[in-house]
Regions:
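N-terminal secretory signal peptides and thylakoid transit peptides that target proteins
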Residues: 1-18
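C-terminal motif of bacterial Sec signal peptides marking the signal peptidase cleavage site
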Residues: 24-25
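Conserved flavin/dinucleotide-binding core of flavoenzymes
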Residues: 34-82, 136, 204-206, 413, ...
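Glycine-rich active-site loop/strand segments that organize a redox cofactor
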Residues: 47-56, 130-161, 312-333
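N-terminal glycine-rich phosphate/pyrophosphate-binding loop and immediately adjacent elements
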Residues: 73, 81-263
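Mid-domain catalytic core of redox enzymes
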Residues: 385, 389, 393-523
Length: 640
């Protein structure tokens, strides 16, 4: 039944001062310092509501209103301004995109060419960081943080030398990672504590049925797996099949030879295996898809059996010899999941550290990793004429080309004004799919390569609660919710790093972090890329009111039996809409195997004169360290 949303609820969830935010720009007249009150670390007065400070904005964030319309007019209809105001601004380097690749490219260039190098970074959003967005909430003098996108730092051992040096330069090295691990509570499953209690929640007759313990371990035949499965509101026959799958009671591929098994797991979808070989009903599949759909952004219909197993899906014990052969791959995948660390605002702190290195005046008092989470950022300092590096927000690039003066002209639109700037070099750190529209002079094969991949959409929501009383009674910090709009529900990262003081008990206000992937539903004949396009449309076309309704209903059903009342306990809602999320990773069921150097992302990322490309799309992998590698490559191309 729909939940009635009062006017107060709407105001709590609406974007506070959105009009002022979009119109205020980054002018000198806006003061953005957040005064720190005397007392415990992490205790703040709320920011001045008239100040330009995007992290405290609630309502619809991510690809927010005003960030995508100009680009869509260009990409969908070929429309852009005919005339531009030529600004008297020339730079050594212009970077299009202030996400991780863009910020890293600017930093690599600054380090190589000197602090006096003139750099301009343009971004269409009202905040920097790309997917690494910071969501900030205030209540009763306390600040609460959560992540609005990119979450974690993978093990530095997997970083290239260039990426490791970049991280070390902002204070993140092996010693700091170890410190972060020590500061991460053992019960915080979201931040890589895989031994922590984590559960599953399914709708029942009287609200959600929650099963605690360690559900992830249960899926691999761990402690109390049978008891956990028997507690699920499922027919006994389905429970029996799940128990067989988790425990490895039988080899579901025993009618195949070894060669046939290997062929099968590389050519058949994971979900088809569950239906045809394990005998599960399609209605049970969401239980087994809930983990991978948020880790990989696609469902078991899109992954082969092998890809599913090595992405963390259940069933490796139930494939006999071939399961043992793939166990090492699965172990490596799970080790990757375990080897993660997280700031309280996700990778937004990494973005803040990079921005402060590029433009020290944005946070002159910040010491580094020890206070990055609580440092006061002055957004009016981002785009100042007297700074060598400038970061210009709310600015959508619509054209990039070399002129006859051995320069790159960059056209962009900022708050309705069409403007042009020039540079000696340009790095495009935006989405691959936009680049052919920015640079129509590119070779056709390069434009085709850039257009091949389709980014994976997500929705990340953060919900500020008056206190943590009801949530604390669930018995775990994270629950998979396979039959709900948001498939993961967790506490926000309560990590005491960067100076942040997280909630200390159930009486403190808290933030609930919720993840949604739209890649659900039955098997489809369409390619995965077409399915991703349809899912992206779903994300774009769903209004905030609908997301708010879904959030309130889901939390009320999950927490209601513990005294939760959405009407009084929810203080604010931030929905981070991410239609263009993870970089497209090639999938065996849909994509051919290309010769080295001939894959679409490799053809697409070729240097184009004074223009280079740096993003995770160009690496076909959605990892921050590869965003840095792409940035390093682009800068090396332009400074060779």
């Amino acid at each position: 039944m729909p939940i009635d949303i009062t006017r107060r609820d709407f105001i709590n969830g609406a974007v506070i001062g959105a009009g002022g935010l979009l119109l205020s720009g980054c002018g000198n007249e806006v003061a953005t310092e957040i005064p720190v009150t005397a007392g415990a670390p992490g205790v703040f007065n709320p920011p001045d509501p008239s100040a330009y400070y995007p992290p405290t904005q609630t309502g619809m964030r991510g690809s927010h209103e005003g960030s995508f319309e100009v680009a869509h007019e260009l990409a969908w209809r070929g429309k852009k301004p005919k005339h531009y105001e030529a600004l008297e601004e020339h730079y050594d380097l212009i970077v299009v995109g202030a996400g991780m690749s863009g910020l890293a490219a600017a930093r690599y260039y600054q380090q190589k060419m000197g602090a006096d190098a003139r750099i301009l970074i343009l971004d269409n959003h009202d905040d920097f960081g790309g997917h690494a967005k910071r969501n900030e909430f205030h209540q009763d003098g306390r600040m609460m943080l959560s992540l609005g996108g990119a979450q974690n730092i993978e093990a530095l051992s997997g970083y290239s030398d260039a990426a490791r040096e970049l991280m070390a330069g902002i204070g993140i090295d092996d010693n700091f990672i170890e410190f972060m691990n020590q500061q991460t509570p053992d019960e915080l499953f979201l931040a890589g504590k895989m031994e922590a209690e984590n559960g599953i929640a399914m709708p029942g007759a009287n609200g959600h049925v929650t099963v605690g313990g360690n559900w992830l371990a249960a899926m691999f035949g761990g402690k109390d797996y049978e008891k956990s499965v028997r507690a699920l509101p499922l027919p006994t026959t389905e429970q029996d099949k799940l128990i067989d799958l988790f425990a490895g009671h039988q080899d579901f591929l025993d009618d195949f030879s070894l060669t046939e098994k290997w062929e099968y797991i590389n050519t058949t979808s994971y979900n088809r295996y569950l239906v045809d070989k394990v005998g599960l009903a399609e209605s049970t599949l969401p239980i087994l898809n809930a983990i991978v759909i948020n880790l990989a952004g696609v469902s078991g219909w899109n992954l082969t059996v092998l890809e599913g197993i090595t992405s963390g899906c259940a069933g490796i014990k139930s494939m006999g010899w071939v399961g043992k052969a793939t166990a090492k791959l699965a172990e490596l995948a799970l080790d990757s999941l375990l080897s993660v660390t997280m700031f309280p605002d996700g990778n937004a702190s990494v973005a803040r550290l990079l921005v402060q290195k590029l433009i020290p005046a944005v946070a002159p008092g910040m010491q580094g990793t020890q206070d990055v989470a609580i440092a006061r950022f002055d957004y009016s300092a981002l785009d100042q004429e007297n700074h060598a590096t400038r970061l210009r927000l709310n600015s959508t690039a619509v054209g990039v080309r070399e002129n006859n003066n051995n320069q790159v002209e960059v056209d962009y639109v900022q708050q309705g004004k069409a403007q042009r700037v020039t540079a000696d070099h340009c790095v495009l750190a935006c989405y691959n799919a936009l680049i052919p529209h920015l640079c129509p002079e590119m070779p056709e094969d390069q434009k085709e390569g850039l257009s091949y991949g389709v980014k994976t959409p997500f929705v990340y929501a953060n919900v500020q609660l008056k206190d943590g009383q009801a949530y604390s009674k669930l018995g775990a910090t994270l629950f998979q919710c396979p039959y709900d709009p948001f498939q993961w529900v967790s506490t926000s990262p309560a990590v005491a790093v960067g100076g942040y003081e997280p909630p200390r008990g159930p009486d403190d206000p808290m933030v609930v972090f919720m993840m949604r992937s739209p890649m659900t539903g039955p098997e489809q004949p369409a390619s995965c890329r077409d399915q991703l396009r349809m899912a992206r449309h779903t994300v774009y076309s769903t209004p905030f009111d609908d997301y708010e309704q879904q959030i309130r209903q889901q939390l009320q059903s999950l927490l209601g039996k513990h005294g939760f009342n959405h009407e009084t306990d929810i203080q604010a809602i931030t929905v981070n809409r991410i239609p263009h999320g993870y970089a497209y990773a090639y999938l065996s069921l849909y994509d051919p195997k290309w010769e080295e150097g001939q894959a679409p992302h490799e053809i697409g990322r070729a240097q184009f004169g004074r223009i280079s490309i740096a993003n995770t799309d160009s690496e076909a992998t959605a990892l921050m360290n590869l965003a840095f590698d792409a940035a390093w490559r682009a800068v090396e191309e332009q400074t060779a």
